Design a protein with these regions (language model features):
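Asp-based, Mg2+/Mn2+-dependent phosphohydrolase catalytic module
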Residues: 2-15, 115-118, 127, 131-132, ...
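Alpha-helical elements of Rossmann-like donor-binding domains used by nucleotide-donor carbohydrate transfer enzymes
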Residues: 33-34, 49, 76-80, 96, ...
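Short, acidic loop-to-helix structural element flanking the phosphoryl-transfer center
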Residues: 71-72, 89-126, 133-136, 164
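A metal-dependent, Asp-based hydrolase signature
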Residues: 44, 58-95
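Short helix-capping segments at alpha-helix termini
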Residues: 39-43, 84-89, 143-147, 175-176
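Hydrophobic side chains within well-formed alpha-helices
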Residues: 31, 46, 93, 144-147
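Active-site neighborhood of HAD-like aspartate-dependent phosphohydrolases
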Residues: 6-55
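A generic alpha-helix surface/boundary motif
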Residues: 29-33, 75-76, 133, 164-165
Length: 232
């Protein structure tokens, strides 16, 4: 946990935890292994460009009121990222990488942390940009789905995070004030968006990235999902 963290005795234990999925519970860059097999020397570049373009597109369609489902945005982002890198991605290769996205690797500490929260009687959910079908498949593949309820998708609002309508799904589903819910994300922009909305927040800064400069910070910053347990 970061040195500037708010002391534990100044934060009431949250009544529920909502996790982001992509990048937080699941490693979005694990697709780079398959990409590297297909395009030796360029797999990691493709994985990172793909993720960046996916986030860019989610913001663009939200700002413009032109919603497209996350599965389609993910495919769109893959196509343009491969083209930008001059990689010969054919239809079969595209389908292979998209299938890989359905089966992203979970971070190794996840299950133990979720089980520890369940043992404490904490309700555990997710709030994700992913489509409902995407989330069902990928959380099953990761072996986590039986530990998670509710599974909240922004598809219900047709607005991607950081739109307030997306974050409103949590309090509505859980019957709690946003401040009573711990929102956990490995994306600083997502943690900040949730903080603006009123959640108690934890940014999982796995990459030791600098804090965004937006006049606000997440409640706490950690480096592993295990840091969630310090709230309880």
């Amino acid at each position: 946990m970061d040195a500037n963290a708010i002391p534990a005795d100044r934060i009431a234990p949250p009544k529920a935890v909502l996790f982001d999925v992509y990048g937080t519970l699941l490693d979005v860059y694990s697709v780079g292994l398959r990409a590297e097999q297909m395009f030796p020397g360029a797999g990691e570049h493709l994985a990172r460009a793909w993720r960046d373009k996916q986030i860019e597109y989610s913001r663009l369609v939200s700002m413009s009121g032109r919603y497209r489902p996350f599965w389609q945005l993910t495919r769109d982002a893959l196509q343009v990222s491969a083209a930008a890198l001059r990689l010969p991605l054919d239809a079969a290769g595209e389908d292979s990488l998209m299938n890989e996205y359905r089966h992203l690797s979970a971070f190794p500490e996840n299950r133990a942390v979720l089980l520890a929260l369940a043992d404490r009687g904490v309700r555990i959910g997710v709030l994700s940009n992913g489509d409902p079908d995407m989330l069902d498949v990928t959380l099953r593949s990761a072996g986590l789905i039986e530990l998670i309820d509710p599974i909240l998708s922004v598809h219900a609002t047709r607005r991607y995070k950081t739109d307030p309508a997306a974050y409103a799904l949590g309090p509505q589903a859980l019957g709690l004030a946003a401040s009573e819910i711990l929102f956990v994300s490995s994306n600083c922009w997502d943690a900040i968006g949730a903080t603006w909305y009123g959640y108690t927040t934890l940014w999982i800064n796995r990459a030791d990235a600098p804090m965004e400069r937006l006049g606000i910070q997440p409640t706490r910053v950690g480096h592993s999902l295990r840091d969630v347990l310090e709230f309880f």
